[in-house]
A protein has these predicted regions:
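A short, Trp-centered hydrophobic/proline-enriched beta-strand micro-motif
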Residues: 181-189
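N-terminal cofactor/phosphate-binding cores enriched in small/glycine residues
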Residues: 75-89, 105-121, 131, 236
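Internal helix-loop-helix
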Residues: 111-182, 225-231
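A structural signal for short hydrophobic beta-strand segments in well-ordered beta-sheet cores
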Residues: 203-206
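A short core secondary-structure module
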Residues: 213, 217-264
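Extended, charge-enriched "interface" segments that sit outside catalytic cores
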Residues: 2-92, 99, 104
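Conserved small/polar residues in nucleotide/adenosyl-binding loops
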Residues: 270-275
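Short beta-alpha junctions and helix-cap segments that line functional grooves
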Residues: 175, 190, 201, 219-221, ...
């Protein structure tokens, strides 16, 4: 006997999201609204987002893009040096036993410029392409998952990538060079009562009376690299704006120095070298 099923209508991604929003409560609508406003506009949908919506579209990832010979050589040369360093210095079983990445390993990665892989060359970084960055993180992950997460979180959701995309020239000149000399960054979004839902976060940033700085108040958790970072990205609510006659929540990203008065790391979670 042949089993049959009735497929759901093949809604587009935006139509499906709007349909979900129309049936949700106020909090759900706010969360979806914030997510949609932050969504990047691409010529084609991403494979991952389509898969999430139940649409398998392999043509979005095949054939895989090829590197130019020049870019591939840059990656090959770096990976050769990196592989030698990892083989000689990184012991994932030691990371498992001690629950920390040895300082000597971190110092060695700093010398290799591993914390400035995508930082533009004009600011002291290596200026690698996204493809070479992906290749490098893949190599590190094959040795130790925790070390790969350290490097990836630092550069993708930590300060370097948001700074590269949205930072002012003054900010770039101030912060980018630090990542070539050992600064480690982290990302703080998740909160105890609301998880990773930015629409419901309670952390607030209020402009000081003299208008020179913001004052942040709140609690964050699950901040990858948070216990060893000296600079982090903190997501916080700022004063709402009136848009088309309606008040809209505002969420801003702040670059925060960890030695700022009032910042406290309460607890560090253990990790393993395996992903």
């Amino acid at each position: 006997m042949t089993n049959t099923r009735q497929d759901k209508p093949d809604l587009g991604q935006e139509e499906a999201i709007l349909a979900q929003a129309s049936t949700g409560n106020k909090e759900t609508k706010e969360a979806l609204e914030i997510a949609e406003e932050a969504r990047e506009k691409y010529t084609l949908p991403s494979f991952g987002s389509e898969l999430f919506m139940g649409n398998f579209k392999p043509d979005l990832i095949f054939p895989y893009p090829e590197q130019s010979p020049e870019d591939k050589k840059i990656g090959d040369d770096y990976i050769r040096s990196l592989t030698h360093f990892l083989t000689e210095n990184l012991d994932p079983e030691e990371v498992d036993r001690t629950r920390e990445i040895p300082k000597a390993v971190i110092d060695g990665l700093v010398k290799l410029g591993a914390f400035a892989l995508k930082v533009p060359k004009e600011y002291g970084g290596l200026g690698f392409s996204q493809t070479n960055y992906n290749r490098i993180i893949q190599v590190v992950a094959s040795y130790c998952g925790s070390t790969a997460v350290l490097l990836s979180a630092h550069q993708s959701i930590g300060v370097p990538q948001p700074l590269k995309m949205f930072g002012t020239e003054e900010q770039k000149k101030k912060f980018f060079p630090r990542f070539r000399t050992g600064s480690i960054s982290a990302f703080a979004l998740t909160e105890p009562d609301v998880g990773s839902d930015p629409a419901q976060m309670s952390t607030e940033a209020k402009l000081s009376e003299d208008g020179t700085h913001y004052i942040l108040n709140g609690t964050k958790l699950w901040c990858t690299n948070g216990t060893i970072a000296d600079i982090i990205i903190v997501m916080a609510k700022t004063a709402p704006k009136i848009v088309k006659g309606r008040e809209k929540k505002q969420i801003s990203a702040f670059i925060l120095e960890m030695n700022t008065p009032g910042v406290e790391v309460v607890r560090s979670e253990e990790h393993t070298s395996e992903l």
